[in-house]
Amino acid sequence: MSRYLGPRFKIIRRLKTLPGLTSKRPKYKKRVRRSSRPWWKKSRHLACLQEKQKIRFHFGLTERQLRQYVQITKKVQGSTGQVLLQLLEMRLDNILYRLGLAGTIPGARQLVNHRHILVNDHVVNIPSYQCKPQDVITIKGKKTDQLKTIITRNRNKARENKIPYHLTLDLSQNKGIVNKIIDRKDIQLNIKEMLVIEYYSRRI
């Protein structure tokens, strides 16, 4: 399954807030609830599917990519759900988004694909690149002025969202630093990751 490129509001109306997908918020219309099916409850499978879709669309993954990440978690010690989120949080495109260098993860992915980003002074054009503690992320020199304007705009839009403690942003030097791997308690996503693991448990 390819990466979703359709209307983003359609997704967040169904799955609720996904800040990595879009910074905009749709206007919800009030609907009168019908009581024709008061017995209806969300099935376990549907709950797992929705959590899986939240992760997919928030981080901008294809179905194949997410499946591969779940497979990796089974080879690593620790809680599989926590490891899954940590792997996704340490992707280069997500780090750029969390630093405020891009307004959304798709926007961060575009910066990486266009070779604007350096990791430890080397150009990296792979959005899924796994960042490590002590990695230094900078913006390529010849585009600095243009991108600083974009960065400032994105930071102003997200003033209420503080940069996570595992990252440091130095706008004076136009760089970000990965201090450490993020802890689960500091991942502020409304996602039940163990339901995602459960979803794939019978499919891998």
Curated annotation (Swiss-Prot):
The keyword rRNA-binding applies. Gene3D superfamilies: Ribosomal Protein S4 Delta 41, Chain A, domain 1, RNA-binding S4 domain. GO terms for biological process: ribosomal small subunit biogenesis; translation. One of its GO terms (molecular function) is structural constituent of ribosome. Residues 90-150 form the S4 RNA-binding domain. Coiled coil: none annotated. The keyword Cell cycle does not apply. SUPFAM superfamilies: Alpha-L RNA-binding motif (SSF55174). Keywords: Chloroplast, Plastid, Ribonucleoprotein, Ribosomal protein, RNA-binding, rRNA-binding. One of the primary rRNA binding proteins, it binds directly to 16S rRNA where it nucleates assembly of the body of the 30S subunit. PANTHER family: 30S 40S RIBOSOMAL PROTEIN (PTHR11831), SMALL RIBOSOMAL SUBUNIT PROTEIN US4M (PTHR11831:SF4). This is Small ribosomal subunit protein uS4c. The lineage of its organism: Eukaryota, Viridiplantae, Streptophyta, Embryophyta, Tracheophyta.
